[in-house]
């Protein structure tokens, strides 16, 4: 049973009438451009064919009723005429409430709705299940009430909800790619202007995501430390962000910087350049160059930004040994565990999977999870 069939059936069962509208919003994976977003730099994600689906209908009053199919059909209900407060015990509810609250501030011209939500974006794998939910909820009200908000505004609304209502300090990439993704394309995003450029993916290439299933522990504290080190670097150059520093400027005075800060800055500057070049390589179908850039990105995250772990490095090594120069592989996400992303010719996917299954657990004691994805369409009707 598809997610849409599941939410549609549950809607009729719980609310006693059929849903009128079905909305999906995808998760995402970032192909290259790591820790560049908060430095006003570039990222190159694609939406994936794992998504949040919502079956919904307008109500005649100002109440919002929600059923979460993936949480034992837990329910939430709140009014648009009363202050929307955080839910004490249901964290999933706060993503819905936060999006609706911030949507009201943008465009108060909408009424109540009934929603049934389900998703298959793996949680805790760094594939943006939360952004997918936020964008899906925003898109529900945009469609039901014909709100004059575009995809970028729906994305910004989701980011605001996560930062200010849920209390998680995320960048804009995850929501933007979920809202604006394009089938068979990646999206080059300028995190300063929020400008986007669709980049065609080569035919016959699979997006493979492998979760190391290594339990991340340092990610929060170390993430904040990396941000502070980048800000220190930007201040040294008297710039608003590292986006504004050239590699030549850096190389001329790198010896004057604290050695650790210098390594962090070098990663961001080289990663920005790699990301822009990667978009060009992908558009030209040059998988060999894309693979080189992904390898350089991984080495930079390992040696200069120091955010990889041995389990992740092992996965990258195993995949690279199979694909050689026919594709690329690197860690993706914040670091200290999580996933690797690989661009793999479809014919080689079984061989990659077999190699990972044979070697990863034997070398690390952890069983991986393997996903084969297609670059998919952003949020909309389904």
Curated annotation (Swiss-Prot):
Annotated GO MF terms: ATP binding; galactokinase activity; magnesium ion binding
Amino acids binding Mg(2+): 130, 162
Gene that specifies this protein: galK
GO biological process terms, semicolon-separated: galactose metabolic process
Pathway membership: Carbohydrate metabolism; galactose metabolism
Family stated for the protein in its record: Belongs to the GHMP kinase family. GalK subfamily.
Domain of life: Bacteria
Protein name according to UniProt: Galactokinase
Catalytic activity: alpha-D-galactose + ATP = alpha-D-galactose 1-phosphate + ADP + H(+)
NCBIfam families (alphabetical): gal_kin, PRK05101.1
HAMAP family (alphabetical): Galactokinase
């Amino acid at each position: 049973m598809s997610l849409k069939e599941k939410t549609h059936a549950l809607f009729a069962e719980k609310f006693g009438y059929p849903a009128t509208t079905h909305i999906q919003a995808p998760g995402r994976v970032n192909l290259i451009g790591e820790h560049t977003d908060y430095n006003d730099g570039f990222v190159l994600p694609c939406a994936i064919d794992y998504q949040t689906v919502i079956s919904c209908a307008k109500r005649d009053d100002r109440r919002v009723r929600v059923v979460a199919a993936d949480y034992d059909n837990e329910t939430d209900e709140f009014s648009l005429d009363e202050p929307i407060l955080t839910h004490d015990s249901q964290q999933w509810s706060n993503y819905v409430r936060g999006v609706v609250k911030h949507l009201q501030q943008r465009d108060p011209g909408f009424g109540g709705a009934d929603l049934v939500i389900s998703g298959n974006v793996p949680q805790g794998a760094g594939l943006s299940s939360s952004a997918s939910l936020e964008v899906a909820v925003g898109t529900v009200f945009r469609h039901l009430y014909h709100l004059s908000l575009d995809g970028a505004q729906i994305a910004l609304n989701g980011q605001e909800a996560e930062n200010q209502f849920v209390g998680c300090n995320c960048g804009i990439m995850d929501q933007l790619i979920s809202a604006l993704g394009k089938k068979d394309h990646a999206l080059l995003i300028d995190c300063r202007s929020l400008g986007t450029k669709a980049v065609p993916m080569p035919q016959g290439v699979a997006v493979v995501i492998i979760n190391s299933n290594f339990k991340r522990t340092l990610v929060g504290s170390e993430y904040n430390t990396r941000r502070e080190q980048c800000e220190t670097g930007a201040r040294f150059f008297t710039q608003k962000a590292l986006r504004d520093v050239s590699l030549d400027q850096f190389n001329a005075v790198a010896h004057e910087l604290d050695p650790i800060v210098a390594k962090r800055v070098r990663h961001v500057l080289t990663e920005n350049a790699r990301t822009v070049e990667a978009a060009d390589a992908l558009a030209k179908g040059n998988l060999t160059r894309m693979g080189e850039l992904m390898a350089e990105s991984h080495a930079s995250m390992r040696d200069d930004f120091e955010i990889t772990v041995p389990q992740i490095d092992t996965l990258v090594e195993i995949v690279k040994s199979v694909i050689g120069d026919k594709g690329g592989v690197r860690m993706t996400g914040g670091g200290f565990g999580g996933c690797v992303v690989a661009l793999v010719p479809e014919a080689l996917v079984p061989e990659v999977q077999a190699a990972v299954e044979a070697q990863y657990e034997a070398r690390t004691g952890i069983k991986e999870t393997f996903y084969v994805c297609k670059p998919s369409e952003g949020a909309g009707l389904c």
